[in-house]
């Protein structure tokens, strides 16, 4: 309920309560007393509504804060895992594919050491912004910790994931070049045509592919369709 609706309801309640009090009295009250009593009841109801509305807003803010990375303003790991569980269950019901991707900034520590933490933070913000811009509103982008990001892509099959990985790499390269940063990225993505047994299995698979891309020499991507075709490597 909105604050405006709550105030209207509280006014109606105050008038109803006041009318009930007046009807219950054997003798009528003087007009100033009537006005004062009505004003007091209205004030009490309005104050209660405003207080409850403020508490509700604060609770919603705290809940959102607990699910958001404070630097990049994308979801944090906790929110990402919760969303992955929801989408995995939906994929089981609908039979639609689900894709998850992990992205790691190669040698991010060097950026922090050479340019400072402020530039490192700015780089992470730029990465998060690029990932949001390359994905749909129904998809989820999260900072999983440090310089590692995750993407949860609903109803996304193999060909669509292939295209997304290409778009991500191009967008990230452009964002880094614009700021003059020398940074590459390792990406691991997996599309589950058949839903995995658990969220942990889904996350672990993407993480393993990401590290496989790093072992291939970094600045690349590994993509796999579970049960479909062998892992692909994009240098």
PLM region descriptions:
Residues 1-33:
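Hydrophobic transmembrane alpha-helices
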Residues 128-129, 160-178, 205-207:
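Alpha-helical scaffold within the catalytic cores of cyclic-nucleotide enzymes
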Residues 42-66:
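Juxtamembrane or sensor-core-proximal signal-transducing alpha helices
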Residues 123, 150-168, 202:
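Short helix/loop segment flanking the catalytic signature motif in cyclic-nucleotide metabolism enzymes
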Residues 140-143:
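A short pre-motif secondary-structure segment
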Residues 63-82, 103-117, 125:
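Conserved nucleotide-binding and Mg2+-coordinating catalytic segments in signaling enzymes
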Residues 162-166, 192-235:
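Catalytic-core segments of nucleotide cyclases and related cyclic-nucleotide turnover enzymes
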Residues 63-64, 77-97, 128-136, 154:
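Short regulatory alpha-helical coupling segments
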